[in-house]
Amino acid sequence: MNCRLYLPPGYEEGKEHYPVIYVNGEIPMEGIMTVLVNKGVRADFLLLSVKPKSWNDDFTPWTAPAFRAEEEAPQGRADAYLSCLAEEIKPYMDAHYRTKPEPVHTALFGYSLGGLTAVYALYKTDAFGVAASLSGSLWFDGFCAFMEREKPLRTDLRIYLSLGKKESRSKNPRMNRVAACTERAEEILAAQLGETGGKVFFEWNEGGHFHDIEGRFVKAIMWWMAVE
């Protein structure tokens, strides 16, 4: 896996410790930071994007039929990916950078299958106290049923879900269930967190799955900064 790190302004000269956003997959980092700067937002956090060896394999929790006829079936290696992230990459970051290592200051973001894995992580590791699933592939075969059977490992979670209003128009009969599945995931998480102090926020965006990805990340980051 390849990683790319963003450091906040003044990091090299200071002694302050910072919260960290880990991102499942590559993101348009320069564009996101430019939008934040243009909004007058000071990005006082570390951000590490993690490129997987295989998007479809590393960001699926179990095997499933191929998403499209021309693709191979996903191999369901998210457990191994999350183990590496939580047990190797995060400890390295905490040891070599001035992070705030506590889960409350540690977020996991992801888009599409990366967003699916951000939610899945809540049931597999307690390393992350915040998760953001942007246009997450929560339609994935059996995922809502998995959420209903299992429980998150933390009860103080803060969770952000977002979805484009046109995403359910997909011609793919599995993917066009995404709106119903995301709404169901929100219900499940809200019920599981109950009165424990955890919170779930769901935001609708304009457009389809690939519309304004930078803007959707900016919205999620600004939500996180407000609750951090």
Where do the protein language model's features map onto the residues?
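A domain-start/cap signature at the N-terminus of enzymes
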Residues: 1-19
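The feature captures the conserved acid-bearing segment of alpha/beta-hydrolase catalytic domains
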Residues: 138-212, 219, 224
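Alpha/beta-hydrolase fold nucleophile elbow
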Residues: 98-111, 131
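Short glycine-enriched nucleophile-adjacent loop
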Residues: 115-124
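Active-site loop/turn elements of alpha/beta-hydrolase fold enzymes
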Residues: 50-52, 136, 207
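Serine-hydrolase catalytic machinery in alpha/beta-hydrolase-like enzymes
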Residues: 20-84, 88, 92-98
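The conserved beta1-alpha1 loop
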Residues: 19, 24-25, 135, 163
